[in-house]
Amino acid sequence: MKSIQIAIDGPASSGKSTVAKIIAKNLGYTYLDTGAMYRSATYLALTNGIEVTDQNRIVDLLAQYPIRFGRDENGQQLVFVGDEDVTLPIRDNQVTNNVSAVAALPLVREELVRLQQDIAQAGGIVMDGRDIGTVVLPQAELKIFLVASVEERALRRFKENTERGIETDLESLKEEIAARDYKDSNREVSPLKAADDAITFDTTGVSIEGVVKFISEKAKEILDR
């Protein structure tokens, strides 16, 4: 049976992960949350008292505490570093505010991109991140670049944090997201940008179902060829 690689990129809180999970489940594909991998690397640095710019020591930690994924009894994604479940801790504000610095480190990116590409060899996959269509899966048959206003993305993150019991301030989130956009778009290594052959879709005011429908239709067009 024909299967394809689907790359979904976009800035923070543009809806990538939520949509990617649903599409992967609907197609019976593997879903890989690359953002969780960079968050895990950031978490390792912070909890081990290592500077978030010390790429050699962070890469050593990644070898010592490998990142892996699992599922709970409800099918929800779990993230581990070594044997530690870090599913919730990696969403902490301290991790969020430092992950761009870690994601900009060439050696860390090289290590995690290699791992991501290895996982993608298994067959049909939906991967989301910042550089999937440009660096990780440049040959992906379907590349989507999701965008949304800062205001809408801050509101989404606010709701997510509230549901997780993380105390947050909406105005602060707007500032943090705008700052992260700048860092992600202007870093030297693998900056956030749409691939030349990506389809850009503005999710502002669009429901999750609407975004899933749009991407699913594009995938079906390719699979039906």
UniProtKB/Swiss-Prot annotation:
Record-level GO BP terms: nucleobase-containing small molecule interconversion; pyrimidine nucleotide metabolic process
E.C. designation(s): 2.7.4.25
KW Amino-acid biosynthesis (keyword) present: no
Keyword tags: ATP-binding, Cytoplasm, Kinase, Nucleotide-binding, Transferase
Pfam annotation, one family: Cytidylate_kin
Binding, ATP: 10-18
GO cellular component: cytosol
Chloroplast as UniProt keyword: no
Recorded catalytic activity of this chain's protein: CMP + ATP = CDP + ADP; dCMP + ATP = dCDP + ADP
GO molecular function terms noted in the UniProt entry: ATP binding; CMP kinase activity; dCMP kinase activity
Leader peptide range in chain numbering: none
Protein location: Cytoplasm
EC category name: transferase
Annotated CDD domains: CMPK
PANTHER family (alphabetical): CYTIDYLATE KINASE (PTHR21299:SF2), CYTIDYLATE KINASE/PANTOATE-BETA-ALANINE LIGASE (PTHR21299)
Alphabetized NCBIfam families for the sequence: cmk (TIGR00017)
Family: Belongs to the cytidylate kinase family. Type 1 subfamily.
Protein name: Cytidylate kinase
Organism: Streptococcus suis (strain 05ZYH33)
Gene field: cmk
